């Protein structure tokens, strides 16, 4: 079974080519970009299941800060799309920062093809599990509100939450 669409963002054309070959048997569609600044527009036009994001784009800079900035941007704009970070300049602190900023996982270059594919599949599967839990919660909340004949205060009381979080959950 092939997964949907992956967006790979890396400034190195050779890396993009290698990843297209490596991931061709796993994904239906592989979109590539040499820079992350065009990704927000692309993400509005193309449905994407996962993003593989390099962490460094400026010549001579290998701190990973650019990747962290774009990771936070993608998480803010498209929280449902998992982002896996990839870099040749990895250290434990950078990986921790990436995970704390919302990355689904972290891969180092050079990568092992099987490990990369497994990591991407796992990230997609985990993101779909979260959506399922949210849909279960939403269904339950709507049933309680219906049972309370639309009385939000009573529904919040039965759910053990205050009205404000209940309103937020109903908006989703």
PLM regions: where:
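Short hydrophobic/Thr-rich beta-strand motif most characteristic of the beta2 strand and flanking loop
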Residues: 27-36, 42, 62-63
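Short amphipathic alpha-helix used as the core "switch/output" element in two-component signaling
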Residues: 62-79
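Two-component/phosphorelay signaling modules centered on CheY-like receiver
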Residues: 13-32
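Bacterial C-terminal helix-turn-helix
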Residues: 134-172
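Active-site beta3 strand of CheY-like receiver
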Residues: 46-57
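C-terminal output helix
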Residues: 110-120
